């Protein structure tokens, strides 16, 4: 199969993966309106073409939290990454490090912090949820520090799990789900051998290190579901600050008032995000929410954005709307599922190539020169 864009990786991943895994990554909440708008709203933003600008000295490099990034992209935290490729978190982290960008480890990764951090030559980021079991949270923070993690991504838009109806149809949940998953694995032998057999253990590594006595993935997911905390408030972030003195990014901001509160709290960054359309259907796409948030807090806090980014052109659009850096999730996961570490490396090279073309043809020699003047019109204007 010819791979020329991230959408090709999606098609390849759909063929290779058991349906319960593909649709778990691909799906969103409820009727998936926000999931679709994340992509379509970005695609509807027209770039302003400029020519004859002598773009021979173009640079994608940027600085974020005392890190140099080869381009303004980081790999987003994606749960269960190790179910999409053998020891998937390790492979994705290596690809990100090789390209000179951060990898963000999810709380609910298959591989533990201690397995991934030594595999790369730059500090990874770590994502954490607010959970009822504060002992686990403290343990995770201590282990992240010990592993050399510098930047914490604190997810605040998941006090309760979203209603993901597609999971019941695909076999991730619903009637006879375990039997359906076994059958799907049997009918996808390449995945069954590479990940299902050779990718063991299949537990949530960061949680199993804390709980001990592994009992299986379903048990850990059940424990996690019972530990999401709807009482989350800014006081919980104050508690986190007692244990974390490095950069803290608050992920899940869609409103300018919440962004202002993040500045007051003293956060180092925010991620404008609707969790990839996986939490509350009907909320704004990240592209639609970003301009007002940038108007409110740009310069006071670092602004990251995710949800709907499928190409280097989309990265340029998000930067023009006000982001300093973007996170990509599904795009890298499909590449990982298809060709492992090599797939993610190739995807990042595609993103970089697409960004370079877009910057040359919009007259932006550096990331700082990508502004709203790079757009013909903003979304909704």
UniProtKB/Swiss-Prot annotation:
The active site is at 275 (proton acceptor). Its main location: membrane. It comes from the Bacteria. It catalyses: (S)-lactate + A = pyruvate + AH2. SUPFAM superfamilies: FMN-linked oxidoreductases. It is found in: Cell inner membrane. This is L-lactate dehydrogenase. It comes from Pseudomonas entomophila (strain L48). The lineage of its organism: Bacteria, Pseudomonadati, Pseudomonadota, Gammaproteobacteria, Pseudomonadales.
